[in-house]
Amino acid sequence: MPAASATMCACRARRPGAVAVSAVGQTGVVASIYGKGRSKDNPGRSIGIRADMDALPVTEINTFGHISQNKGRMHACGHDGHTAILLAAAKALAKSRDFDGTLNLIFQPDEENLCGARAMIADGLFERFPCDAVYALHNAPGVPAGSFIVQAGPVTLSSDVADVTIQGKGGHGAMPHRAQD
């Protein structure tokens, strides 16, 4: 399913004023939008804006008109919203180009599988699309409309995998004092 999301993002990001490159780290997409007077050879300062676009292995159970059309796949956790916001930004910014520099819109796959960003970086994301700063896009339903939360440095969630071995003697919930942990 990441390939279908990537194809949709690449097709919708390709518009006058934007150059979309797909297959960054296999299924990642980057759309570069050059401000007025800027080009690939004269990019100026560059800012990256990143949104996740992976569907999760979840079956959506509801009757909404916007229910997933792919059984067993759902753009949960706001991923569809993040993708839509970045695509809308691409449309507006490519049309106006009323800024100085370059915007690299980064559509990251496989956030939940812990491999999308790593694959894009290993494929030369920042060598191919240099960024002076990168902002991660994530919805925040508790924040008032029209507001942004910005913090310097790493701020979004990270996942790690660890193996833990616990040695002891199991017990029963009715007699926890007999367990050893």
Give the role of each language-model region.
Residues 56-58, 64-74, 81, 99-181:
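Histidine/acidic-residue-rich, glycine-tolerant segments that coordinate divalent metal ions
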